[in-house]
Amino acid sequence: MKLSKKFVVGLAATAIVGSIGITAASAATIVAGGATFPLNLMESCRATFAGDTTANAAGDKIDYTGVGSGTGRANFFKNDYKFAMSDSLWKTSEITTAGSPRTASNFVFMPLIAGAINVAYNLEGVKPAGTVLQMSSATVAKIFAAQITKWNDPAILADNPVAAQPLLLGLNGQAKIALAKKSATKATLTATLTKKVVDNKTKNLIITSSVDGGKTVKKIYNKKPVAGKLTLSVPYAVGTIYSVTLDKALLGTVSVDATAITLPDTPITVYKRKDTSGTTNNFANYLNKTQPTIWNKVTNDAFDTAFPGTVPTDGSFVAAQGNDGVANGVMGKNGAIGYAEVSFVNERQLAGKTIASAKIKNGAGEFLAGSSKGASLAVGAAATDAATGIVTFNYENTVAGAYPITAVSYGMANTAAFDTTANNTIVKNYVNYVLDTCAPAVAELKGYAPLPTSLVTISKALAAKIGA
């Protein structure tokens, strides 16, 4: 897999310029931007759209910049962007700020893609090493409200009781590790990897066993992985923990015996968004709706505005630009935690970076890491306005497998009442290409969730209004 962004720097807003003039004889470029949540998908779709002679015979291009949902909407309303993406809803005040002739009736707002918001963290000193931490909504809310400041807080420990962990799902469901006791001295370990993991130039699948609290560690498998299911008969003794690594990326551990987890007293550093962010809006809404006594403010694109109180200024909260910036910050700081769309975490894990996704407790009582499948189930359990396509999540739905912190990203485009140029034709072609071709083909590979058929139908009806 070719990584969509370099990790050294986060996203930066580029200078905003108008659309290149369109002529019948030449391709045109549509200047667009907005949410960073769908950025990895947008990069893939706009690249293939440019070369798709069926959907885009003229070879037109979409120049999309991830600047955050709030800035994206503002630039769209000012007509600096001909197309924008936003993970949060627009406000009438934003239209008023943009001024005439912008009105609520001369643009289209339609759902294009969904995805999971992962709670990403980086923590050394967890025992057993490689354990993927679990968190309830109350624990997540307290951490991001600065009410929990150390990793060995009793609330985090309570979410991670002594228990067996015979199943490990990682990399957006691309890796599945299962363990079953076979006899007093043997166990069966199965590793199921998708072609995506293998095609990522992964050199080695490494499995180690440890007993006596990690005092005795043995490498029991170290070979190039293959796509499909690998079944191994592995040595077993009571208390054995098996760690699974792809090159340098530790996926986690499995065990058939109840194992106590030990956490270090490392201070927690929270990475939040610097920009006005739809990811923040959805994340804060989840906290407010599930834990209103802890996170007692209504949601907002600005983290500091949604924060229940005053954000600490002692360095325990760090602002970062975009989903990329948050993921970069978390992977670079021991004790860090943040929130980002699942693809930004997975691509770093595949590159061997130190970052993990906490398993979040859903309404069915399951602890799950964010995934395309979990997000799809959450969208399916949400309420959708058939006229507008706006999705309202029930964060405590009891659907098995539904990941609770899920968001939808919406496209924004003009009607003929605002813009009568051929820009609209290009934007409409691109939106339909995303819905019909690109998202169904690559969304899950990139870490997103394609919209259900019923929602695509609504989006297509809305897209028909672009330029009309």
PLM regions and their residue ranges:
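Bacterial Sec-dependent N-terminal signal peptides
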Residues: 1-11
